[in-house]
Amino acid sequence: MTTMAIVGAGPGLGAAVARRFGTEGFGVALIARSQERVDALAAELADDGVTARCFSADVRELPTLTAALESAAETLGPIEVLQYSPIPQKDFMLPLLETGPADLVGPIEFSIYGPVAAVQHV
C-alpha cells in the first residue's frame, strides 16, 4: 500500500486530501497536535472506506514530529507523499515594524524547521 502523511491534519484541507488519496488506495497518516482531533477525523474517514491512522506531534518539537513519521511508516509502510499544512498560531502574525528577532523563533521553527525535518525524514 502506498502511504501519505498529512502533517497538520484537520477538518478542512487535511480531511479533503486524506479522503481523496485514501479513496484511491493510499494509507493515510494523520498527524496533528491534538490526538482527539485526528482520532475523530480517522473515524469519519473510515466511514468512507479510508485506511487512516493517527499520530500526535507538535511541529515545533522536532523529536515528536520525527517519531510520528517513524511510527506512521512502521504502521502503514514507507511514506511516499507528504503534505505539510499546519495552521500557524495567531501570535505569529505581528505587524512587521513591531516584530523583533525573538518574535521570529516560533514562526521559524514552524515554517522552516518543521517542514525541513519532515521532508528529510520522508
Question: Language-model features: where?
Answer:
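Conserved glycine-rich cofactor-binding loop
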Residues: 10-12
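Conserved alpha-helical elements of the SDR catalytic core
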Residues: 17, 72, 121-122
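The beta1-alpha1 cofactor-binding region of Rossmann-like NAD(H)/NADP(H)-dependent oxidoreductases
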Residues: 36, 56-68
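Hydrophobic positions on the long internal alpha-helix
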Residues: 68, 83, 114-122
